[in-house]
Amino acid sequence: MSQNIQIGTRKRSRANMNNSTTTGPANNTSSNKTFLDNFEETRTNKLLDEMFARQNSFLTDNLRNSLDLNQADNPLRPRQHQHQLFLDNENAIELDEEPRIINTTINNSNNHNSSRVDEDADDDIIFIKEQPIQFSSPLILPSSSSINNNNNIVTSNNPGCGTAATSNSTYITTPKKFKKQRTISLPQLPLSKLSYQSNYFNVPDQTNAIVPRVTQTENELLHLTGSCAKTLEGNKAVNLTIAHSTSPFSNPPAQIASLPQSNLKKQIGSSLRKFTSNGSSESASSNKSNFKTDKDGHYVYQENDIFGSGGRFVVKDLLGQGTFGKVLKCIDNKYEPNYVAVKVIRAVDRYREAAKTELRILQTILNNDPQGQFQCLLLRECFDYKNHICLVTDLYGRSIYDFMCSNGIARFPGSHIQAIARQLIRSVCFLHDLGIIHTDLKPENILICDETHIAQKLPLKTVQSLSKRRREASKGKRKILKNPEIKIIDFGSAIFHYEYHPPVISTRHYRAPEIVLGLGWSFPCDIWSIACVLVELVIGESLYPIHENLEHMAMMQRINGTPFPTDIIDKMFYKSKHKLGNSPSDLNSTVIKHFDRKTLSLQWPEKNKRGDTITTEKSMKRVLQSCDRLDIYISKVLKQDYGDSLSINWNLPPEKNWSLINSKLAWKRQTHSSSSSTTDELDKETFLFWYWFIDLLRKMFEFDPTKRITAKDALDHEWFNLGILDDGIATYNNTQG
């Protein structure tokens, strides 16, 4: 079923409209005016009809096969309101005030009231789209928020939402700030509209009601170390089932029980003689060779290895490995579907303890989300086999990282980025309400549920510009997923917020500044990591491709367009001086020494005592040439798809940004010049989509963790009310290969 689109006009009555003639001697030319008015009205109606037809055709073609949520085989078919459609005026966004396809100006005779802000100040053309949704998404206000008489949200002491700036140099957005005028509602993927409601959760400390936390206070972050005792106490309560090796008897127990008594004695005697003469039975020998452990406690991967009680699991592939152990693709001979993923932990006490923490976290997630609706990997079962803790989970597709590496164009469509962002933030919101901090969010730990995709052959010139590895992996094609549903995995580094906090967490590229600076860390570190992931989906590569602290901090300042706030640097010095909390062992040598104690500013490029620059030229290029302020950096990448006219300045309001872009587009139309074939595809809806995306990133990349936007506030951000027409919408659940 294709989407139904209704197009209509919203008409308003005005007291002083001159659309009727008056009688009397003063109106001698009334008949002429009536004729002209009728002529202009007919001409205008004809132009409007043409515009409606073109818009209707444009939107219908883009939506016809894109968002068919009523297919029986669609896994994302709405579970709630399944047979209801709604008129999506809520998601309306601004259009250009001067539509290009209409050259006729309709004058308002009530000019003396034009400056008056009135709800009926103009005749808007509204495009109303019927769009199914999966869940309702009510507005959740922070505890410190209220609604004033003008139906505006008033927030006090809530840094996540932002406030109006007093300086003209910086523009800071607030929700519902702009009046919506000529509007059009573009489609969104169902995953982009997933809702989140605060619930009552069951957590290990028997606390049933978790109060959604707005942020962390300064004192919490400064002194936060967690409790080792609570971690050890929790791990002691973990009970693991011991999976025994296969019996030395060749017959299974059921078969042995069915043997006559005389035959049973012969069978036992024969097996014992064979066992004692050879030192082990054939089965025991087979088991020993099937599941080997090296001197470092790692399981030695071997295809077709058999392990688990009764030889339940058969190893078929190696999915991943690390310091913790290995992840295997296995056949489960007990349950269907047969293929599962088994995480085999190193047989070392340190990693076994960490696995017990992971097990408690996975069990908490399972208890509170048995259906897996919050995009977290669910634990099937666990057991202990030959001193290896084994965690069994469902098997999904490749990670986002692997998918990007095998793609000719690593960048994701905007609609897919929004869908993935919604799932990630919503999942983290759920985890944070459970008191869980993931600490290691990155593309490698985000799995794609369904890898089916549409492959588009790339132009020869583009293929030739690819690296040899990417060219071979992608076969010269761009892959666009049909369904961007994801699962978050690897809770091996996750912690409960009240338990022990290691001094260093997260993979370097996704590490928050409070961790680098040796400050306390908590829930906000996950938000920073998500922001890094989202930028990577846009630009197709890591935002921070670095391996040491000084370069990392210099890049952070350049991308944020501002130095580190002096108050958090002052806290860093204070914490180091008084030895508060946990600090990285190399904090003084790799971080603190690069800050001036008087100005509290980062000293980069690095200089020696004589004032000579000692930072390498290669490092200088990485910082100065490979990145820029985030809005400028992303704009450069988006120009590849939308032309040179797209430019976003986060210090200017959206209307000012669009005015500048529109001027560029008008100049190009007049001069008939275009540097890109896609330049004319840029419209205001597309610009606003990316503008508010960058605005959300800016709030997620806040240096001060106490002011960084929370997961719950991020779900209410304006960006999630906006749609976009792109390849991600067009290929959603497309039946063609």
From Swiss-Prot:
Keywords attached to this entry: ATP-binding, Kinase, Nucleotide-binding, Phosphoprotein, Serine/threonine-protein kinase, Transferase, Tyrosine-protein kinase
Residues making up the signal peptide according to the UniProt record: none
BP GO terms, sorted: negative regulation of transcription by RNA polymerase III; regulation of RNA splicing
Active site: D440
EC number(s) stated in the UniProt entry for this protein: 2.7.12.1
Entry GO MF terms: ATP binding; protein kinase activity; protein serine kinase activity; protein serine/threonine kinase activity; protein serine/threonine/tyrosine kinase activity; protein tyrosine kinase activity
Broad enzyme group: transferase
CDD domains in the record: PKc_CLK
Reactions catalysed according to its record: L-seryl-[protein] + ATP = O-phospho-L-seryl-[protein] + ADP + H(+); L-threonyl-[protein] + ATP = O-phospho-L-threonyl-[protein] + ADP + H(+); L-tyrosyl-[protein] + ATP = O-phospho-L-tyrosyl-[protein] + ADP + H(+)
Record PTM: Phosphorylated (auto-) on Ser/Thr/Tyr.
Domain of life, source organism: Eukaryota
Modified residues (Phosphothreonine): T562
Record: residues binding ATP: L319, G320, Q321, G322, T323, F324, G325, K326, V327, K343
Family according to the record: Belongs to the protein kinase superfamily. CMGC Ser/Thr protein kinase family. Lammer subfamily.
Protein name: Dual specificity protein kinase KNS1
Source species of the chain: Saccharomyces cerevisiae (strain ATCC 204508 / S288c)
Gene: KNS1
